[in-house]
Amino acid sequence: MSLLKITDITRKYKLGQVQVTALGGVSLSIENGEYVSIMGPSGSGKSTLLNIIGCLDLPTTGTYIFGGKHIESLKDGELADIRNQQIGFVFQQFHLLPNLTALENVELPLIYQGVWGRERGERAKAALESVGLGDRIHHLPFQMSGGEQQRVAISRAIVGNPSLILADEPTGALDSKSSENIMEIFQRLNHELGITIVQVTHERDVALYGQKVYHLRDGEIEHIETLNSQGGN
């Protein structure tokens, strides 16, 4: 069953008197439980497409159905509810609040969801333990390595039990060992919890952890690659 379906979407911007087409008629369908990558050179439309999938932006034309809802027809508040309740975001930069502990950073989405008291703390702690950070819950970001900070960011993304995780260059700021660790976590979340994952990456090794690769060029899908195995194993 499709979690999301995009049909012939475009995204156009005005830069002064010039109209820029970031996406030019993109169509794709992603099933529940799939792990897919979006690859392409700079300026190919990868981040624009991810922003639309994540309800951070809307297409100029075309349709986008997520969880049975026509996203392009929703109001800002309805889009915010979908982002908060159904989508987890992981970025290249960790975006952790520096004056909050790992636990407090992970609790933030639950505050917005109206989860209070002991339940909020227990869920945040469980999310951190699931990525191997049970002994770092009271550490501040500056007391952790880059890989550990990205694991906190992943915990924050999954603590609300989303159906979809969107990752934009999630290993871009990490060394090779930390990158491998992060990708193994994503793969486990996909395999064991059935979370759908869509990631943007420039790195072939990272894309190999998924099941399918959408190759973008000049705002269009150039071809779709189906992978036989995951993680290069």
Where are these regions (language model features)?
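ABC family nucleotide-binding domain
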Residues: 3-216
